[in-house]
Structures are given as C-alpha cells and as structure tokens.
C-alpha cells in the first residue's frame, strides 16, 4: 500500500518532468479489514504455519491439525486398500477362469473395457461402479510379474475332476465353500491316497476354513482314510480339526455336541501308543476351553483343564486363563473370576494380566454394578503404564451407567456416575489415537451400546431415539442392499423381513427403558455442560426422522417414530412405544399384532376337533400348533422376557392404568386362559344350535349367522395366543407392583391366584431350586408392599410368617411394614417381624417359644 506522503512525492516529481501536466491527487482505498475464506483455512489447516498465541492454544491447534491429518490419511489408505483388494480379486478370478478354461476371452475383453473406469475412480478418490470393476491399478502392476496361484492345488483338482465346481466354490475369497471341496474329495475314487503329508497340510489343511459340523466329520474321515489313526495322524491335523470345531459356538446345544466330538478326538489321540508322537499344543487347549465356555458346563471345563495338565503336562497360559475368565463371566460366578484374576497377578510375567484381561474384569464390575472396583482397575492400568483401548473406556462408561441405576450402590450419586461415564465417551471421541480403533465394528457397537445405556438410564429419550434410529436405518439399508430388491417379487414383504433382522435386541431394550424413565420436566445430563450439549446436538441433528434424504428413497418402509427431535408429553411416549413394539415384533406385512386367522387355520382347527374324541388329545394338538404359530407370527428374537418387562414397565412408571391393562392383555397369557379358550371351542354343548334353528323357519338364517360368528370369535381367540408370551415369574411381580401403584385390589387378587396356579405347572417345577426361591422371594416382597399400601398389616405379617422357612427375609424387604407398625405402635407385631429379620435372634426365639422335649 502506498502511503500518502509517498504519493505526494511521486506527483511532485512528475510535475517537474512534465510541466504541461496538471498535478492531481488520487485517493487509494484501503484494504478490507474482514478476512475472507476463513472456512477454507479451518478445513485445511496448515501444519507448517504456526499461529501465535498461548501455549494452550498452540497445543489445541496442533491436536486438531494432527487429528485432521490422521483422518485424511486413514480415508486415503482405506480407499487405496479397497481398490487394491478389488483389483487383486478380479485378477485372481480371471486367472483362475483361464486356468479352468472358462470364458477367458470374454473376461479379458471385459477387463480391457473397464480399465478406464477404475483408473478414473482411483484418480478421483471415489469407488468404481459395482457393475464395471477393473483390476488395472497399483496392485496389478506390483503382482504382474508373479505367477498366478490356482484356486486349488493341481493334485487335488485332478482328483475332483470338476473345474466348474472348484471355480464356483473358491472363486469368492470372502465366502469360500470348502464343504463342497471336502465332500468332492471324499467322494472321489482316490481321495487323498498317495499324497504326501506336506502337500495335504500345505495345499488343503492350511487353507480350509468355515467348515460345517458335517464338513469337519467328512474331513476327519478323509484324513483317517489316508493316514489312519496312529502316528501318521499328527498334531497338525488334530489342530486343524480342533480349530474348525472351535468355530461352532453359536448355541449352547451345538456347543455340547462339539464338546463330545472333541472328547472323542482326545480319546483317539490317547489310543495311539507311539512314544514319539508330538504333544498337543496350547492352541488346542484354548479351542477346547472356548467350546466349553459356550456350552456353559463346569464339568466340561474341569475335564479339559485336568486332562491337559495331568495327561499332557500342558499348563494354561494367559490366553487360556482369559478364556476361563470369560467362562466365569458368562455363568455369573463372579467371585471365582476375581480369584482367578488375583492369582494371575502373582504368576509368571507371561501370565500377567494385560489390557484384554482388564477389559474382562471391567465386564465383571458391570455385572456387579461396582463402580469403585471399575475405577480401581482403571487406575491400575494407568499405574502399570498400559495403554487403555476403546473397549476399556467403553466398559468403564458402561459400568458407571449400570451402577447409577441402583440408589444404594450409587450412594445417591447417580448423576455423577453418568457424568463420569460420558467423560469416558468424550475421551474416545476426541482423542486422535482412538480414531482408527473406532472403525472396528465390534468397538463401534460397544461404544454405541454404552451410549444407549447412559441415555436410557438418564431418561434421555431424544438421544436414545436418535442413536437407535441411526443404527437401525444403517443396518436396514445394508440388508436391503444385499437382498437385491430388483429380483424380489414382493418388496414390502422383503422390507418387513429386513426390519425384523436389522434391529439389535439390546439397543431396542435400552430404547424401551428410556421410554419408561421419561420425565417431561427433567433436563438431560448432557445439557448441563458445554461439551455435552454440543455432542448431543450433533448426534440429534444428524438424524432425519422423515427420511427426506435421497438415499432414503428406497427404504420401502420407515420406523414409526414421530417426526420431532424431542417428545413433549407422556402420551407421545406411550403411543410411540406401542407403535414401535407392534412394528418390529409382528412379521405380518402390515406390522399388526391383531391377527386375522386364514381359512387354512380355521379348517385346521375344525379338522383337529373332528379327529380327536377326547378333549385332552385336542388340547395337546392345539398347544403344539400354537407354539409353531408363535415362531412364525412374531419376531421372537426381539420378544424376549427382558424386552417384555421393559415394554410393560413404560405405562407402569408413567402412571397409565388403561395402557398397562391393554399391553398386559395383548402380550401375556396364562395356561388357564388357553385351556378355557380351547375348551370353549371344543365343547359341543357350546356350539349346538339345531333346536334354535328349527323353532322358527324365518329366523334360521339369523341363527346360523350368529353360530358362525361365535365360532369365528373362538378361533380368533385361540389364534391370538400366537402373538402372546406365556406368563413367567417376573411378570407376576410386575403385575403386583401395578396393583400396588394403581390401588387395584381385583388385579392383586387375580395375580395372587394365577401365581399359585403357576407353581403347579411344568414351567415352574422345571426351574432350579435357586431360581424358584428367587422368584418366590421377589413376588412375596411385592405382595407385602401391596398389603402395606392397603394398610392390611395383618395379612402382610401372615405372608412373612408363613414363608420364613423358605425365604431369607432382610430388613430392606420389610422396611415399609416396620415403619407402618411403629406408627400404629403395634409392639407385638414389631417383635415378631424383627425376630424373623434378625438372624441372631431367631435361634433365641425358637428356644424360648418351642416346648422342651425333656421332662
């Protein structure tokens, strides 16, 4: 910028050189003080230019710049890796097709046509179109000089003799079908005979994966046919079998079957008397412990541990001890988990607990709702100079959330514990070193579950809805993308099936808990500080409940959530929770839990009634049919005892008696209700209309229509049980609490009678003694509280005195009754009540009141 004095000097000199030019003065406008394009500087920070300011500002700027660069590099590496994998997969497919003689020329022409598409996508940083992938990228340039590996070793492919089978089974690296390869080898004439052991291990055993239980049995027969059951069947082959069997731990019953097969393999290994046979390994022991954990069997775990220690001289290592901790965690034997964890600290350095072990113990703290132990473990991690990972911070926050639900455990600091949990979540979100770990689906789901727990226990319905909706829509779109809707004849039915699979039962239960804890006048804890308010606002603004985005055009159906960010009344909470329950649990295309039986159902019931001469046989047939209907009509993956309790707790806590009665009738049924409905349909006396039809001829059609309508109502009543769940212990306790809150004496009487009838059913007698006592204790406590609320103290005392032999009464169970007796100064009842509660005085009371047996 030219200053004014310099400008005057220039004009003076120009005037001296050019006398005929008139001197003029010009005013030059100054530059604008406002800086432009600030958004560009914020989005693309300059790492070389250091801005001035305090040390704290410099540190914050450096952290932000480093975080930005890390995200940029991770995104670039992710795109590059994806393109390399795509090109490598296509190259291998083409070379395998050429080796098998399947369409080589056609595939080569397709590669040449699609090369420009992939090259352009790499330059632009975008994904190529799925229909036109091309392998001309960096991966192909690097591997162009290498020889292509065949999908299957030539020695094995020759024995199969079917190139198309090999190609179709192994061409997709992400979903290879080794069951077909193993079955084809076993059905071949030569099988594995004549092949060297090294070739079998390298070309088959090291590559095989994802075998079913039948495939593992076939592979075992294949190896036994070649190597026998003696010395030639070495440890490496046993290791492959055990490792493949260890993958089948999805269900407890399946795990028990796998345990039996593992025991047979160990018996076969013991039957070999060769002194030079190789010993088993720690990996095999860990596979056995993994399956024993899934089977939830103490006997199986003791069998494997004792056998490997005594017979094979293999002591458990740290990985094995972690598996033992997982077993204790699943079986809720938490005291033994603490003992094992304490023993690991005093073993060798190789057994010292690491972050993974501490994460398991944080889950134990979560189950115990012990936040103090969780914080102590976190301080131990810091003192040992170990680096906590995302799972560590997530489990810490989860333990804080669980402890905040119990007023006694939290010591009146529920909000402080939830605030501490949210601080751990903020550390995960804002720390750059956890940026890459959050891309792991397991870690991301764990953080999401923890956030849902914190929001639900705080009653933050707005945040819980946003998190649930975002996860549900993402899962639904992924399922619909894989479903290939163009080839589906009924898109609405496919969308309904996708929604039933997209919902996580744990997240759905947390959303129901958030509804039940809703308070219109309560401020969410995140709004109490600036960072939390900003974090909550960002999450809620990223959700579009209306589905107006362009990517939501193909959703075919949307979740029935109100198109608002925050719910403003209990009526909205009740209506939305009921709509979600019916939408997700019903497998019907319209999402309704009010079924209409088809003509096939009507004819089936009529046929059952005609084929059975006795009511008992008809009742047995209908019960089995109702169970089959329940699996096909309702999404049983979501309709669990836990979600049912959360669903029924919403109107109970919000104080809506009509809504609670409607949901209870819609969701729960007893055995007597089913029996009465079936008897009403079966008994011929209830459906005889011949006399009425012959009295007046003109009214015959009216009588017949009335008769048909009654039959339809009975069938509808029977079919409605397919959409309900049979009553169980916790439901009786919840119903008694509802009778206490709503002061409904008739409901309490009915629940008391139904609970007595439930004790005679097979569902109660099949329970363990521990579970039966726990159920009786909780229901007795709820009954005592009802009698106290109704000021029927003598009946409350009768319940306690009659059950003291089976129930271990504590003072916190009878606190309300004791305070009520003190208020009316009933000293006799107080003395009896304290004698039952106080364990030390029980023996004295029995000795003084019971008659002596000696003269």
UniProtKB/Swiss-Prot annotation:
Q: Record's InterPro entries?
A: Pentatricopeptide_rpt, PPR/CCM1_RNA-binding, TPR-like_helical_dom_sf
Q: Which domain of life is it from?
A: Eukaryota
List the Gene Ontology MF annotations in alphabetical order: mRNA binding; rRNA binding
A Pfam family that this protein carries is PPR_2
Q: In the UniProt record, which is one GO cellular component term?
A: cytoplasm
Coiled coil, from the record? none
PPR repeat ranges are 234-265, 317-351, 354-388
Stretches for region Disordered: 29-61
Q: List the disulfide bonds.
A: none
Ordered alphabetically, the record's keywords are:
Mitochondrion, mRNA processing, mRNA splicing, Repeat, Transit peptide
GO terms, biological process? mitochondrial genome maintenance; mitochondrial RNA processing; mRNA processing; positive regulation of rRNA processing; RNA splicing; rRNA metabolic process
The places in or outside the cell where this protein is found are:
Mitochondrion
Checking Gene3D superfamilies in the record gives:
Tetratricopeptide repeat domain
Additional remarks: Involved in mitochondrial-nuclear incompatibility, a major determinant in reproductive isolation between species, through hybrid incompatibility of Ccm1 and its interacting partner 15S rRNA between yeast species.
Query: Assembly state and interactors?
Result: Binds to mitochondrial small subunit 15S rRNA.
In UniProt terms, what function does this protein have? Regulates mitochondrial small subunit maturation by controlling 15S rRNA 5'-end processing. Localizes to the 5' precursor of the 15S rRNA in a position that is subsequently occupied by mS47 in the mature yeast mtSSU. Uses structure and sequence-specific RNA recognition, binding to a single-stranded region of the precursor and specifically recognizing bases -6 to -1. The exchange of Ccm1 for mS47 is coupled to the irreversible removal of precursor rRNA that is accompanied by conformational changes of the mitoribosomal proteins uS5m and mS26.
Q: Which family does it belong to?
A: Belongs to the CCM1 family.
User: What protein does this entry describe?
Assistant: Mitochondrial 15S rRNA processing factor CCM1
Task: State the gene name recorded for this protein.
Answer: CCM1
């Amino acid at each position: 910028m030219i200053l004014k004095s310099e400008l005057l000097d220039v004009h003076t000199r120009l005037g001296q050189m050019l006398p005929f030019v008139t001197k003029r003065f010009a005013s030059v406008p100054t530059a604008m003080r406002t800086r432009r394009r600030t958004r560009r500087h914020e989005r693309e920070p300059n790492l070389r230019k250091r801005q001035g300011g305090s040390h704290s500002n410099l540190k914050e700027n450096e952290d932000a710049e480093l975080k930005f660069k890390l995200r940029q590099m991770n995104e670039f590496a992710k795109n590059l890796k994806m393109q390399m994998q795509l090109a490598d997969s296509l190259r291998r497919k083409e070379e395998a097709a050429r080796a098998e003689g399947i369409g080589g020329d056609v595939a080569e022409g397709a590669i040449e046509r699609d090369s420009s598409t992939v090259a352009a996508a790499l330059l632009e940083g975008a994904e190529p179109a799925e229909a036109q992938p091309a392998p001309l990228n960096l991966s192909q340039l690097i591997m162009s000089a290498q020889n292509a590996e065949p999908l299957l070793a030539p020695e094995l492919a020759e024995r199969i003799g079917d190139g198309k089978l090999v190609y179709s089974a192994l061409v997709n690296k992400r979903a290879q079908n080794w069951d077909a390869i193993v079955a084809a080898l076993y059905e071949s004439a030569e099988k594995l005979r004549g092949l060297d052991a090294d070739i079998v291990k390298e070309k088959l055993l090291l590559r095989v994966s994802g075998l079913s239980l039948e495939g593992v049995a076939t592979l075992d027969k294949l190896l036994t046919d070649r190597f026998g059951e003696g010395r030639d069947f070495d440890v490496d082959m046993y290791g492959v079998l055990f490792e493949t069997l260890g993958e089948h731990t999805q269900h407890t019953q399946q795990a028990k079957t796998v345990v039996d097969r593992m025991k047979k393999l160990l018996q076969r290994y013991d039957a070999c008397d060769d002194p030079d046979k190789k010993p088993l390994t720690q990996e095999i022991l860990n596979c056995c412990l993994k399956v024993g954990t899934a089977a939830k069997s103490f006997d199986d775990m003791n069998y494997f541990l004792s056998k490997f220690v005594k017979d094979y001289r293999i002591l458990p290592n740290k990985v094995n001890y972690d598996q033992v901790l997982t077993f204790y965690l699943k079986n809720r034997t938490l005291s033994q988990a603490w003992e094992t964890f304490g023993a690991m600290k005093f073993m060798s350095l190789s057994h010292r607990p690491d972050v993974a072990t501490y994460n398991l113990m944080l889950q134990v703290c979560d189950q115990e709702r012990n936040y103090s132990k969780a914080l102590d473990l976190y301080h131990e991690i810091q003192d040992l100079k170990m680096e906590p990972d995302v799972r560590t911070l997530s489990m810490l926050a989860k333990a804080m959330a669980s402890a905040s639900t119990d007023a006694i455990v939290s010591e009146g600091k529920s909000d402080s514990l939830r605030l501490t949990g949210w601080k751990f979540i903020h550390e995960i979100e804002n720390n750059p070193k956890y940026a890459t770990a959050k891309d792991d689906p397991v870690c991301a789901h764990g953080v999401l579950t923890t956030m849902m727990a914190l929001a639900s226990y705080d009653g933050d319905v707005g945040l819980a809805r946003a998190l649930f909706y975002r996860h549900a829509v993402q899962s639904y779109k992924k399922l619909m993308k894989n479903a290939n809707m163009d080839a589906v004849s009924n898109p609405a039915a496919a969308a309904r099936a996708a929604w039933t699979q997209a919902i996580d039962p744990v997240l759905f239960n947390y959303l129901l808990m958030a509804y039940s804890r809703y308070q219109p006048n309560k401020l969410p804890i995140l709004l109490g500080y600036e960072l939390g308010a900003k974090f909550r606002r960002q999450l809620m603004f990223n959700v579009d409940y209306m589905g107006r985005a362009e990517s939501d055009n193909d959703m075919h159906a949307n979740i029935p959530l109100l198109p608002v960010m925050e719910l403003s009344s209990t009526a909205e909470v009740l209506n939305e929770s009921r709509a979600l329950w019916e939408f997700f649990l019903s497998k019907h295309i319209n999402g309704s839990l009010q079924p209409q039986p088809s003509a096939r159902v009507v004819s089936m019931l009529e046929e059952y009634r005609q084929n059975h001469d006795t009511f008992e046989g008809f009742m047995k047939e209908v019960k089995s049919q109702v169970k089959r209907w329940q699996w096909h009509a309702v999404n049983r993956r979501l309709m669990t005892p836990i979600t049912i309790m959360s669903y029924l707790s919403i109107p109970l806590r919000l104080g809506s008696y009509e809504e609670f009665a409607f949901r209870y009738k819609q969701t729960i049924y007893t055995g007597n209700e089913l029996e009465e409905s079936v008897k009403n349909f079966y008994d011929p006396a209830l459906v005889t209309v011949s006399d009425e039809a012959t009295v007046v001829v003109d009214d015959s059609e009216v009588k017949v229509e009335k008769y048909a309508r009654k039959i339809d109502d009975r069938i509808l009543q029977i079919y409605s049980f397919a959409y309900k769940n049979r009553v169980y212990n916790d439901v009786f306790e919840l119903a008694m609490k509802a009778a206490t809150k709503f002061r409904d004496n008739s409901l309490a009487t009915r629940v008391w009678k139904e609970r007595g009838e439930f004790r005679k059913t097979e569902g109660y007698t099949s329970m363990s003694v521990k579970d039966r006592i726990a159920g009786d204790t909780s229901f007795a406590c709820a009954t005592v509280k009802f009698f106290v609320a109704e000021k029927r103290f003598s009946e409350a005392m009768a319940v306690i005195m009659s059950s003291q032999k089976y129930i271990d009464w504590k003072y916190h169970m009878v606190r309300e009754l004791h305070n009520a007796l003190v208020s009316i100064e009933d000293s006799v009842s107080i003395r009896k009540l304290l004698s039952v509660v106080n364990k030390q005085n029980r023996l004295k009371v029995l000795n003084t009141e019971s008659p002596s047996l000696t003269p």
